[in-house]
Amino acid sequence: MATRMKSSPEESHSADNGAEAPSISKKAQQTRERILQAARDVVMEGGAGHLTLDAVVARAGMSKGAFLYHFETKRDLLLTMIDDQVSAFDGGQEERELPFVGDPDPWLSSQVSAMPDGGMQKMSAALLAAVAEDPTLLEPVRGWYRRQYENASKSPRGTDIAGIVLFALDGVFLAEMMGFPTFAAEDLSRLMHTLQALARGELELTPIDKR
């Protein structure tokens, strides 16, 4: 991970005066989150092209030196932002599955209900644009997709149905993320209900010759 949890000059001074290590770690974590939020704000407001170290430093209201204690380069910052994005998708999976306990595949059912909101989609689009300068930054995202489709291949609903659900969700997500026009909100909502019914086993795909 690119992030370095080093203590800033101010934190080092506190340590010299007998401050406990946990408080230093907490302060470093708070500073890290402050930087990441500043970077998110810059991207959300101006797009990936405006994501520069100077812009983030100014937005965070700190010195360049303090920033560099946590992120040495723009690549380090981007990698951490992407890792956090992946963690946001993965985090709380067990909790998201709770409403679907008893379904054939609670994991698959939860994927439909966990579609990211507009803010996360815009952030993802901006980050994808940013990593165009360094494709290796997409490795955490590739790893996440790999896990998703490994789960789908083992779904109790079957690979075909799980694959249809995931491919549809990916299509909706990527289209909206890139700002491509698709369905009206009402039609999209109906589509999501259909996908959810398919995931939960309330709707089945029956070949014509077996109807």
PLM regions: where:
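Solvent-exposed, amphipathic alpha-helical segments
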Residues: 38-46, 92, 168-175
